[in-house]
Amino acid sequence: MAATDLERFSNAEPEPRSLSLGGHVGFDSLPDQLVSKSVTQGFSFNILCVGETGIGKSTLMNTLFNTTFETEEASHHEECVRLRPQTYDLQESNVQLKLTIVDAVGFGDQINKDESYRPIVDYIDAQFESYLQEELKIRRSLFDYHDTRVHVCLYFITPTGHSLKSLDLVTMKKLDSKVNIIPIIAKADTISKSELHKFKIKIMGELVSNGVQIYQFPTDDEAVAEINAVMNAHLPFAVVGSTEEVKVGNKLVRARQYPWGVVQVENENHCDFVKLREMLIRVNMEDLREQTHSRHYELYRRCKLEEMGFQDSDGDSQPFSLQETYEAKRKEFLSELQRKEEEMRQMFVNKVKETELELKEKERELHEKFEHLKRVHQEEKRKVEEKRRELEEETNAFNRRKAAVEALQSQALHATLQQPLRKDKDKKK
């Protein structure tokens, strides 16, 4: 039998056979086991809030989870955009939720907004990288690992009633391949219903024309397909947030009180808050988590592994095992290491040669300087000797002249003394 036939048979997967059970086995409890394990482990959910300062991000979070999160008030004078994550442990019935709310503080407050999206992208990538590093550990513990990957980005749109700002389009375009984006119109009670309807159509048209991929509620699950399809048509959600309770009729409701009336947060005729809560928390929270892992994180992971040289197949679509990839990378690394060592050795040799040439040049310069100083010294010595000889000659000449002068002075003195004696002799005669 040919080798190709053997490979074909060895790689062929046998068709599974359907068998009937003679009695109860017990694996029908697997869903219950999974639920019990999940409840014991708890869940994590991470929300990124992007929007201008003062647009109502904190208020909406408080309204969504029916609690009050302790948050610092943001200033309008931030020099740059910074991400501020805060984690809370929540419990409803016997389900524990580790909720992380990440606020993009200072977004849209700078004069130069060209790079406003960069800190947000870097933060999302940093959470992906942290999870990837945990996965690549030899001794990893994903069960206990606190997953900080962003599961959903609530993008707060200013209710201008006209169109999206260029900053919004650029930012959402940069984020759509990294996170599930749900656009929402904040403070929807500031514009009329007719303006709001036109604004929604305008926003969706601009998102489509600019190729921005927002999160679509899944319709492949029959249990939620119908409601999700209906809710996809309501995007972006126009929301109003409030933690204040106002008495309407005989009951207290969360609402915003105005001189002209009351806007009820949970009244679907007033805003889309209930739709957002249903879609975000009660229906699609697990899908958002799954999409983050299977789509956005997998894209990041694949790109990172390809950068590291890992791939599933070669150019001929032949599958690579991890061992083959490791060996190929090891050979590549050793070859690169050898090349680097050779380059360093050659650089060292060249450096030694250059240093030797420099030392020889310095030695030659020093020798020339020494010879020059030696000649100067000899010339100075010759001049000194010549001066000394001239001085000795002048000294000898001076001494001779001095002796001659002294002799003349002695003779003159002697003659002067002899003259009076002669005169005395002449007088005596």
Swiss-Prot record:
It is found in: Cytoplasm; Cytoplasm, Cytoskeleton; Synapse; Cell projection, Axon. Residues 1-22, 376-398 are annotated as: Disordered. One of its GO terms (biological process) is regulation of SNARE complex assembly. The modification Phosphoserine is found at S10. Keywords: Acetylation, Cell projection, Coiled coil, Cytoplasm, Cytoplasmic vesicle, Cytoskeleton, GTP-binding, Membrane, Nucleotide-binding, Phosphoprotein, Synapse. Residues 103-106 are annotated as: G3 motif. The keyword Transmembrane helix does not apply. Residues 51-58 are annotated as: G1 motif. It holds the Pfam family Septin. SUPFAM superfamilies: P-loop containing nucleoside triphosphate hydrolases. Filament-forming cytoskeletal GTPase. May play a role in platelet secretion. Seems to participate in the process of SNARE complex formation in synaptic vesicles. This is Septin-8. The lineage of its organism: Eukaryota, Metazoa, Chordata, Craniata, Vertebrata.
